[in-house]
Swiss-Prot record:
This is Methylsterol monooxygenase 1. The gene is Msmo1. It catalyses: 4,4-dimethyl-5alpha-cholest-7-en-3beta-ol + 6 Fe(II)-[cytochrome b5] + 3 O2 + 5 H(+) = 4alpha-carboxy-4beta-methyl-5alpha-cholest-7-ene-3beta-ol + 6 Fe(III)-[cytochrome b5] + 4 H2O; 4,4-dimethyl-5alpha-cholesta-8,24-dien-3beta-ol + 6 Fe(II)-[cytochrome b5] + 3 O2 + 5 H(+) = 4beta-methylzymosterol-4alpha-carboxylate + 6 Fe(III)-[cytochrome b5] + 4 H2O; 4alpha-methylzymosterol + 6 Fe(II)-[cytochrome b5] + 3 O2 + 5 H(+) = 4alpha-carboxyzymosterol + 6 Fe(III)-[cytochrome b5] + 4 H2O; 4alpha-methyl-5alpha-cholest-7-en-3beta-ol + 6 Fe(II)-[cytochrome b5] + 3 O2 + 5 H(+) = 4alpha-carboxy-5alpha-cholest-7-en-3beta-ol + 6 Fe(III)-[cytochrome b5] + 4 H2O. The lineage of its organism: Eukaryota, Metazoa, Chordata, Craniata, Vertebrata. GO terms for cellular component: endoplasmic reticulum membrane. A motif (Histidine box-2) lies at residues 170-174. The keyword Membrane applies. The keyword Endoplasmic reticulum applies. It is a multi-pass membrane protein.
Length: 293
C-alpha cells in the first residue's frame, strides 16, 4: 500500500512538472543544440564522443569555472569578499597547483575517461537525440548523483583525515591553507581515485543517457570550484540551494584542517556534529565584529 502511494506521489509530481514545462515558452537554444548534437553523432564515433568529448567537457568546464576566481585577485574591489584576507594567492603557489592539476587530469583522470565508452556500451547507455531525457529529469538525476557523492565524500574524506593515514594522502590537498578555485582538484593521485569514486557511483546507478554524464560533470565541477574559490560572493545563486555548504563552510575546513568534511550539503556535518567548531568560529567572529563596530 505504501509503495503504491509513493508511486502515485511521484507520478503526480512528474505530471505537474510536465504541465508547467508545457506552459513555458519554447527554448530558443533547443534547435541549435539539437543540430549540434545530431552533427556530432553523424561525424564522430561513440568512442570519440565518450572519450574526447568527455575530456573536452571536463577541461573546458574546469578552467572556465576557475577563471573568475583567478581574475578576482587582480581586482581590488573583490578583495573585500576574500574569506582569508591575510593569505593572498601567490604566483608560485598557483603555478605549483597548475602543474599537479594537469598531471592528475592527463595521467590519472584521462585513463578513467577512456573507460567511458566501454561503460556506456556495457550498460546500453544511449547517445541518440530521440532518447535525450527532458531537462528536469536530467536535473533530478544530477541531484541524486550529488546526494550520493556527498555521502561518499563525507565518510571517505573524514577517513582520510585519520591521523594514521592523513600524512600519506590527504595532506597534499591541504598544502594550501587558503584555497582558490583551480586548487579544487589538487590532490594526491590516490585521493583522486578514492574520493572520485563517489562521482561514478551515481552515474552507475542513475545514468540514462550520455548527456547526464556531462551534465553531472558540469554541476560537480561548478560546486567544487565554488567551495574552493576562497571568496564569499554576495548573491551567489548556488547559495539558494537548500543545505548547500558554500565557500565559507569549506574554506574553514582548509583553515582549521578538521570538521566540515562534506562536499556539497551540510546535513552529514550537522548530524555528526563535525561542524561544531565552524559554528563556534562564526559566532566568535560575529562578536568580534560587533565589538570593533
Amino acid at each position: 500500500m505504501a509503495t503504491n502511494k509513493s508511486v502515485g506521489v511521484f507520478s503526480s509530481a512528474s505530471l505537474a512538472v510536465e504541465y508547467v514545462d508545457s506552459l513555458l515558452p519554447e527554448n530558443p537554444l533547443q534547435e541549435p543544440f539539437k543540430n549540434a548534437w545530431v552533427y556530432m553523432l553523424d561525424n564522430y564515433t561513440k568512442f570519440q564522443i565518450a572519450t574526447w568529448g568527455s575530456l573536452i567537457v571536463h577541461e573546458a568546464i574546469y578552467f572556465l569555472f576557475s577563471l573568475p576566481g583567478f581574475l578576482f585577485q587582480f581586482i581590488p574591489y573583490m578583495r573585500k569578499y576574500k574569506i582569508q584576507k591575510d593569505k593572498p594567492e601567490t604566483f608560485e603557489g598557483q603555478w605549483k597547483c597548475l602543474k599537479k592539476i594537469l598531471f592528475n587530469h592527463f595521467f590519472i583522470q584521462l585513463p578513467l575517461i577512456c573507460g567511458t565508452y566501454y561503460f556506456t556500451e556495457f550498460f546500453n547507455i544511449p547517445y541518440d537525440w530521440e532518447r535525450m531525457p527532458r531537462w528536469y529529469l536530467t536535473l533530478a538525476r544530477c541531484l541524486g548523483c550529488a546526494v550520493i557523492e556527498d555521502t561518499w565524500h563525507y565518510f571517505l574524506h573524514r577517513l582520510l583525515h585519520h591521523k594514521r593515514i592523513y600524512k600519506y594522502i590527504h595532506k597534499v590537498h591541504h598544502e594550501f591553507q587558503a584555497p582558490f578555485g583551480i586548487e579544487a582538484e589538487y590532490a594526491h593521485p590516490l585521493e583522486t581515485l578514492i574520493l572520485g569514486t563517489g562521482f561514478f557511483i551515481g552515474i552507475v546507478l542513475l545514468c540514462d543517457h550520455v548527456i547526464l554524464l556531462w551534465a553531472w560533470v558540469t554541476i560537480r565541477l561548478l560546486e567544487t570550484i565554488d567551495v574552493h574559490s576562497g571568496y564569499d560572493i554576495p548573491l551567489n545563486p548556488l547559495n539558494l540551494v537548500p543545505f548547500y555548504t558554500g565557500a565559507r563552510h569549506h574554506d574553514f575546513h582548509h583553515m582549521n584542517f578538521i570538521g566540515n568534511y562534506a562536499s556539497t550539503f551540510t546535513w552529514w556535518d550537522k548530524l555528526f556534529g563535525t561542524d561544531a567548531q565552524y559554528h563556534a568560529y562564526i559566532e566568535k567572529s560575529k562578536k568580534l565584529g560587533k565589538k570593533s563596530d
